[in-house]
Amino acid sequence: MARTSLVVKASREPKFSARKYNRCPICGRPRAFIRKFGICRICFRSMASMGKLPGVTKSSW
């Protein structure tokens, strides 16, 4: 419940632009947000391993 309200609060336009921050739309996590994909690192890993992110492959060398 608290995390849901924080997601809603983060989506509103802040009084000052410096207060704006990104949250994962799936889990609501505020840290480790990957801007290119618009999700956090944990959701990124799970979606990439399921093959839901096109063009993302596990690196190997």
Swiss-Prot record:
Q: SUPFAM superfamilies from the xrefs?
A: Glucocorticoid receptor-like (DNA-binding domain) (SSF57716)
For biological process, the GO terms are: translation
UniProt remark on cofactor binding? Binds 1 zinc ion per subunit.
Q: Molecular function (GO) terms listed?
A: rRNA binding; structural constituent of ribosome; zinc ion binding
> Which residues are recorded as binding Zn(2+)?
24, 27, 40, 43
Physiological role: Binds 16S rRNA, required for the assembly of 30S particles and may also be responsible for determining the conformation of the 16S rRNA at the A site.
- Tell me what this protein is called: Small ribosomal subunit protein uS14
**What is the source species?**
Desulfosudis oleivorans (strain DSM 6200 / JCM 39069 / Hxd3) (Desulfococcus oleovorans)
Lineage start:
Bacteria, Pseudomonadati, Thermodesulfobacteriota, Desulfobacteria, Desulfobacterales
The gene behind this protein is: rpsZ
